[in-house]
């Protein structure tokens, strides 16, 4: 077999002469199309540095949020995972108010005064505004520990020699206004909870100044939306009492010259309003009074139920370190002042190194920093 000789041809050189017996080549065939990516394979877009990146659109942080919340309008609005009870709240408020404006307000405006529908409209819009702000506002969720911070805990678990070992619950103690306060470690969020912070089992988030999880508003009630929640229940009690009184007045005026049953037959919708308001007003008024006491004492529902600063659990009563010893000052501290910013960057983009929740490796060079003493020690 003859050795093949390869000769580099310059671009401007003429082609070599063909042998007499050789066949003249036909037109060159078009190049075969390059095979596309397999179905389901990621599409890569090249960059100037030579390192490819995923061609799909970048994800925002609300799309990979670890809690059980639902986000709307591109992450601008958030709600708890379950919204059935919240929908029932909207249905009761809207249906009762619409029936009142359709069947009672025209008669009362003609007979008594035009101020009745105006007052009802102002109360209704204020109630709906406070409800929507309570439901769609971040209650004060604290972001979870980063991968590197969580890797310190995983490394501590690996050093024990057992894959099923979990260190016991750890606490830290801090002094607040001369009172010792214990900070518990959250194994879900991988951090020590700040004072008055608790982990909501429904939303699966640590919420700052956690009051309670309210299914009626479809959200947790915490530091960033408690003022809206208090304004909602207070204004709702006024609206319910106002509609109840107006419906009773309407039926009383209709029953003049006839019996009360005849008045009920004339406006059956008013009967439905009367029943809804009668069974709702007691719980709403009681809830408003209870939270008025909490605001005046600078307490939360969680602290009151647990008896953190009282002798409800049989222990010694201690002084509330968050109280300012004045009702007016406590009310201003809870309800007034600037709204703290949200600590979760819902609209931010997921970074490439933290986009996927891959298994945590304690030997990752990016996590080579020594863990903080607060992460591995029981006390500071």
From Swiss-Prot:
<keyword id="KW-0399">Innate immunity</keyword>
<comment type="function">
    <text>Palmitoyltransferase that catalyzes the addition of palmitate onto various protein substrates, such as CGAS, HRAS and LCK. Palmitoylates HRAS and LCK. Acts as a negative regulator of the cGAS-STING pathway be mediating palmitoylation and inactivation of CGAS. May also have a palmitoyltransferase activity toward the beta-2 adrenergic receptor/ADRB2 and therefore regulate G protein-coupled receptor signaling.</text>
</comment>
<feature type="topological domain" description="Lumenal">
    <location>
        <begin position="104"/>
        <end position="111"/>
    </location>
</feature>
<keyword id="KW-0391">Immunity</keyword>
<feature type="topological domain" description="Cytoplasmic">
    <location>
        <begin position="291"/>
        <end position="380"/>
    </location>
</feature>
<keyword id="KW-0449">Lipoprotein</keyword>
<dbReference type="InterPro" id="IPR001594">
    <property type="entry name" value="Palmitoyltrfase_DHHC"/>
</dbReference>
<feature type="active site" description="S-palmitoyl cysteine intermediate">
    <location>
        <position position="214"/>
    </location>
</feature>
<dbReference type="GO" id="GO:0008104">
    <property type="term" value="P:protein localization"/>
</dbReference>
<dbReference type="Pfam" id="PF01529">
    <property type="entry name" value="DHHC"/>
</dbReference>
<feature type="topological domain" description="Cytoplasmic">
    <location>
        <begin position="133"/>
        <end position="227"/>
    </location>
</feature>
<keyword id="KW-0012">Acyltransferase</keyword>
<feature type="transmembrane region" description="Helical">
    <location>
        <begin position="270"/>
        <end position="290"/>
    </location>
</feature>
<keyword id="KW-0597">Phosphoprotein</keyword>
<feature type="region of interest" description="Disordered">
    <location>
        <begin position="355"/>
        <end position="380"/>
    </location>
</feature>
<keyword id="KW-1133">Transmembrane helix</keyword>
<keyword id="KW-0472">Membrane</keyword>
<keyword id="KW-0808">Transferase</keyword>
<feature type="topological domain" description="Lumenal">
    <location>
        <begin position="249"/>
        <end position="269"/>
    </location>
</feature>
<dbReference type="GO" id="GO:0045087">
    <property type="term" value="P:innate immune response"/>
</dbReference>
<dbReference type="GO" id="GO:0005829">
    <property type="term" value="C:cytosol"/>
</dbReference>
<dbReference type="GO" id="GO:0005794">
    <property type="term" value="C:Golgi apparatus"/>
</dbReference>
<dbReference type="GO" id="GO:0019706">
    <property type="term" value="F:protein-cysteine S-palmitoyltransferase activity"/>
</dbReference>
<keyword id="KW-0812">Transmembrane</keyword>
<dbReference type="GO" id="GO:0000139">
    <property type="term" value="C:Golgi membrane"/>
</dbReference>
<dbReference type="GO" id="GO:0016409">
    <property type="term" value="F:palmitoyltransferase activity"/>
</dbReference>
<feature type="topological domain" description="Cytoplasmic">
    <location>
        <begin position="1"/>
        <end position="82"/>
    </location>
</feature>
<protein>
    <recommendedName>
        <fullName>Palmitoyltransferase ZDHHC18</fullName>
        <ecNumber>2.3.1.225</ecNumber>
    </recommendedName>
</protein>
<dbReference type="GO" id="GO:0018230">
    <property type="term" value="P:peptidyl-L-cysteine S-palmitoylation"/>
</dbReference>
<feature type="transmembrane region" description="Helical">
    <location>
        <begin position="83"/>
        <end position="103"/>
    </location>
</feature>
<feature type="transmembrane region" description="Helical">
    <location>
        <begin position="228"/>
        <end position="248"/>
    </location>
</feature>
<dbReference type="InterPro" id="IPR039859">
    <property type="entry name" value="PFA4/ZDH16/20/ERF2-like"/>
</dbReference>
<feature type="region of interest" description="Disordered">
    <location>
        <begin position="1"/>
        <end position="59"/>
    </location>
</feature>
<feature type="compositionally biased region" description="Pro residues">
    <location>
        <begin position="27"/>
        <end position="40"/>
    </location>
</feature>
<keyword id="KW-0564">Palmitate</keyword>
<dbReference type="GO" id="GO:0160049">
    <property type="term" value="P:negative regulation of cGAS/STING signaling pathway"/>
</dbReference>
<feature type="domain" description="DHHC">
    <location>
        <begin position="184"/>
        <end position="234"/>
    </location>
</feature>
<comment type="similarity">
    <text>Belongs to the DHHC palmitoyltransferase family. ERF2/ZDHHC9 subfamily.</text>
</comment>
<feature type="transmembrane region" description="Helical">
    <location>
        <begin position="112"/>
        <end position="132"/>
    </location>
</feature>
<feature type="modified residue" description="Phosphoserine">
    <location>
        <position position="19"/>
    </location>
</feature>
<dbReference type="GO" id="GO:0045824">
    <property type="term" value="P:negative regulation of innate immune response"/>
</dbReference>
<keyword id="KW-0333">Golgi apparatus</keyword>
């Amino acid at each position: 077999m003859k050795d093949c000789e390869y000769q580099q041809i310059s671009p401007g050189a003429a082609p070599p002469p063909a042998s007499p017996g050789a066949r003249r080549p036909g037109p060159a065939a078009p190049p075969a199309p390059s095979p596309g990516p397999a179905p389901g394979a990621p599409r890569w877009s090249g960059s100037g540095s030579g390192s490819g990146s995923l061609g799909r659109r970048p994800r925002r942080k609300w799309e990979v949020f670890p809690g059980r919340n639902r986000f709307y309008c591109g992450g601008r609005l958030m709600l708890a995972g379950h919204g059935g009870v919240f929908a029932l709240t909207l249905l009761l408020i809207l249906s009762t108010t619409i029936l009142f404006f359709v069947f009672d307000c025209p008669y009362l405006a003609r007979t008594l005064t035009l101020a009745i529908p105006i007052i009802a409209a102002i109360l209704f819009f204020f109630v709906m505004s406070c409800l929507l702000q309570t439901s769609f506002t971040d209650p004060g969720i604290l972001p979870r520990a980063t991968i590197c911070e969580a890797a310190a805990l995983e490394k501590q678990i690996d050093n024990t020699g057992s894959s099923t070992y979990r260190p016991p619950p750890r606490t830290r103690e801090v002094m607040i206004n001369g009172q010792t306060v214990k900070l518990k470690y959250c194994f879900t969020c991988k951090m020590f909870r700040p004072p008055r912070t608790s982990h909501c089992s429904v939303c699966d988030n640590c919420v700052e100044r956690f009051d309670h999880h309210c299914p009626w508003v479809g959200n947790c009630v915490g530091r960033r939306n408690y003022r809206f929640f208090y304004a909602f229940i207070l204004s709702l009690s006024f609206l319910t009492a106002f509609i109840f009184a107006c419906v009773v007045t309407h039926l009383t005026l209709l029953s003049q010259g006839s019996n009360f049953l005849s008045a009920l037959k004339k406006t059956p919708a008013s009967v439905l309003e009367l029943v809804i308001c009668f069974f709702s007003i007691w719980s709403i008024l009681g809830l408003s009074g209870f939270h008025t006491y909490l605001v005046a004492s600078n307490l939360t529902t969680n602290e009151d139920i647990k008896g953190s600063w009282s002798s409800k659990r049989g222990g010694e009563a201690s002084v509330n370190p968050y109280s300012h010893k004045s009702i007016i000052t406590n009310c201003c501290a809870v309800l007034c002042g600037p709204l703290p910013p949200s600590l979760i960057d819902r609209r931010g983009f997921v970074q490439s190194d933290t986009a996927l929740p891959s298994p945590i490796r304690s030997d990752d060079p990016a996590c080579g920093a020594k863990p903080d003493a607060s992460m591995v020690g029981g006390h500071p």
